Amino acid sequence: GIARRIVDFASALIDFVTGALGCVSMLACMFFGALTGSGMATTSAIGGMMIPEMKRKGYDSSYAATLVCFGGIVGPIIPPSLSFVLYGASTKTSVPDLFKAGIIPGVMIGLVFLMVNIIICKRTGTEVHKPELGPGGERIPMIQFWKERLHRVGKATKDGFWALLSPFIILGGIYSGFFTPTEAAAVSVVYSIIVSLFVYHDMTWKDLYKTFVSAAVLNGVTSFLLGTSTVFSTFMTFEQVPQM
C-alpha cells in the first residue's frame, strides 16, 4: 500500500514526459529507498508493480528490469540508508555524516538516470508524450494543463501523505538528536506498521507475521556479515595493516 501510494505520487509529478513510466519507476525508487534504506526492498516493491506495466507500454523487458535495478541502487544512497548504517558501524564512521554526504550524490544520480531514460525513449520511440495535446489529440491551453497537473499532484500528496512523511520523521529525529540512526530503524518499522495496519488498512495481522519471519531471516544474514566484518576491521587496525 505504501509503495503504491509512492508510485502514484511520482506518477502525478512526472507522467507527462516521454518515457514516463521509466521516469516514474526511477522517481518511485528514490522515494521508496529514502523510506526503507534497502535496495533489495526497493527493487522488489517497485519492480513488482512497474515492470509489468512498462512491458504493456512497449518497453523491452530487459530495459525495464535494468531501469528498476538501477533505481534500487540509487535509493539506498539517499538517506536514511541501511548500507550507510552498516558501513558506519563497521568503520566507526559517523552515520549522520554519511547520510549528509549521500543526499546530493543520490539526487544527482537519480536525475541523470531520468534524463538518460528520456533520451533513450525518444530515440526508440517508446512512450512518447506530447503534454500540450489532450487524450483526443486536441490542443489544450498550458494554463489548463498545469492547473490539472497541480490538482492531481495535490490529490496524490494527500493520499500518500503518511507514506511521504516517514523520511522526514526519520531524518528529523536523527539530526535533532531525538534518536540515534540505529533507533531510527526501529522508529521506521513501527511507523510503517501503524500506517499500513491502521491508516491505509493494506496489511493484515497474517501479513505482519509473514513480514516478521522474512525480516528475521534477512537480519540473521546481515548480523552475521556485520559481526565478521567488525572483527576483521578490528584485526586490521590492531595489526596496523593500513600503515604497511
Which residues fall in each region the model found?
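Alpha-helical transmembrane segments of multi-pass membrane transport proteins
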Residues: G1-M244
